[in-house]
Each structure stands twice: as C-alpha cells, then as structure tokens.
C-alpha cells in the first residue's frame, strides 16, 4: 500500500502496540527495535536504538535495510531509507525517511507443502550460537515465505527469536534459495523422532527467490495429486 494515511495508520498501530520490528540487511546484519515516534510532516520515522550495540553499527553500514513486523495475523514489511543514528543527551534513536510504501502479507491460511517422499530437501546454515558448526537440516515443509526444519536432538538447541543471516535451501535440483531466517517457533516432536521442529520465516528472499519458491510449491502440489490418482 502507498496511501499516506494507510501507511501512517499501520505504523501508529505498531507504535501503540510496541510491536517488535526486525531490521535486516542483505549482508546479514540484523537488529530488533520498535517504533518510537512518527513525524510524517517532516518525513521522519523514529525507531528506538541502543547506540552502543555492535549489531546496530553493522546494520548502519548497509545501504539496504528492510523492516518486518507483525500486527496480529498480518506481516508488515517496508524499506528503510537514509537510516542514521542520532543522539539527544543520553538517549539514542534511529531516524529514517518516512516509508512511502508498506507491504502487507496475511500470515494465516498460507498453504504449506511437504516434500515428496523421493526427495530430500535441506537447509544449510551455521549454528547461530556456534558459528564453526555447519548444519544441514532436513526441510519438513515450506510455504510462501516460511519453512519448517528438523533439528536433531544431538545438535545444540536453537531458540525462538534467533535470526540466522545466511541460509541455503535446496528444495530440488532446480530450486536453490538464498535467504535469512528468523525462528518463530520451536516444537519438540514425539520421542521416536529424536528432535524438534523449527518454524521459520524466510528473510530477504527477493523477487526471484519468491517466484522460484512458488513454482516449487505448485509443482509439488501437482505431483502429489498425480501420485494419489
């Protein structure tokens, strides 16, 4: 949406509800913040910040920063332009140009597909708490913008809220995706499975990646229907 009144209304809801916003860059920098103040007359969006946080310094070095947050069942996403850290006395804040566009995505009702039995999709990443540990996790299911991964119980746990900057998801021979992930849910599976389900959102997938993921979902659905005949 690009109507100024609608953009302002949604951002005000974020401010009033103290909604967490996940900021991320293509280089893998990430930072969590909230909307502090809105000043559309001056064209400014003000976000809370800890000026001494190293993660924030990495984010400010990037020319491309995306903000993602959730209002109930709706995912909000918008670009942050001219992002700068400002100081006033002992307080710090992030100022950016007021967004001209804001994207809304419905979270609930998104169709998830399980990979076919004769395929073995994986996600390759480094453990967020142990960067020297490279993992290859089995993909349990995928949807547009989301993926569920199997974390074996002999691997150190990964907590909800963790962001993983660089992940390669190989769904089949024709579909390889590069993205970041944020872990939203961790669910222990039944004892025989010996592991947990990580419910993740894909970050910075890009237009080509989203189209490739949609093709994979469509093809998997078609093949599953053919196998059931």
UniProtKB/Swiss-Prot annotation:
Broad class of the protein's primary localization: other
GO MF annotations in UniProt: cyclic-di-GMP binding
Iron-sulfur keyword on record: no
Gene designation: ycgR
GO CC terms: bacterial-type flagellum basal body
Source organism phylogeny: Bacteria, Pseudomonadati, Pseudomonadota, Betaproteobacteria, Burkholderiales
Organism: Methylibium petroleiphilum (strain ATCC BAA-1232 / LMG 22953 / PM1)
Gene3D superfamilies in the record: Electron Transport, Fmn-binding Protein, Chain A, predicted glycosyltransferase like domains
Sequence ranges assigned to domain PilZ in this UniProt record: 134-218
Keywords noted in UniProt: Bacterial flagellum, c-di-GMP, Nucleotide-binding
Pfam short name (any one): PilZ
UniProt function note: Acts as a flagellar brake, regulating swimming and swarming in a bis-(3'-5') cyclic diguanylic acid (c-di-GMP)-dependent manner. Binds 1 c-di-GMP dimer per subunit. Increasing levels of c-di-GMP lead to decreased motility.
UniProt record similarity statement: Belongs to the YcgR family.
Protein known as: Flagellar brake protein YcgR
Compartments where found: Bacterial flagellum basal body
Nucleotide-binding as UniProt keyword: yes
GO annotation terms (biological process): bacterial-type flagellum-dependent cell motility; regulation of bacterial-type flagellum-dependent cell motility by regulation of motor speed
